[in-house]
Amino acid sequence: YMYMLISAVLFKNYPKEKRLTYVKRYYEAVSTFKINIPTPIMAGLRTPLRQFASCVLVDSDDSLDSIFSSDMAIGRYVAQRAGIGINAGRIRGLGSKIRGGEVQHTGVIPFLKKFESTVRCCTQNGVRGGSATVHFPIWHQEIEDILVLKNNKGTEDNRVRKLDYSIQI
């Protein structure tokens, strides 16, 4: 029934004379696995929200305004059932000078913990929890610490295990 409902909802605004043809063709394609439907569409298309985005990329810059805006965007997209990609490679590394050395940067780990918490705070309509992959360039100042963030050794202070990571070469 799910595939028929998805097909009907997708084409509900099409002209009546063509709608049933499109519904049947789409149903045939998805029910025989000729095409695959992403989870957000499968889980949410039949709800009033109708989220079509499967994944989004949130690009965070180095300023606090950008980091906190990125965190807000992450929360909103997770609540809309989207998988999250986070480009966090421009966030300065631990000990970097801020305002001419007046302050030293806390590094990426505290901000990753914030992103992790935001991703985990919303379930996607009870179907699954939120998920995110964080992207870093291989030349990032903290790359050695980033590479072991999911490692089972270490303490919760220096691990962020519930995010996934990719390294950009």
Give the residues covered by each predicted segment:
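Extended catalytic cores of very large enzyme megasubunits
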Residues: Y1-I169
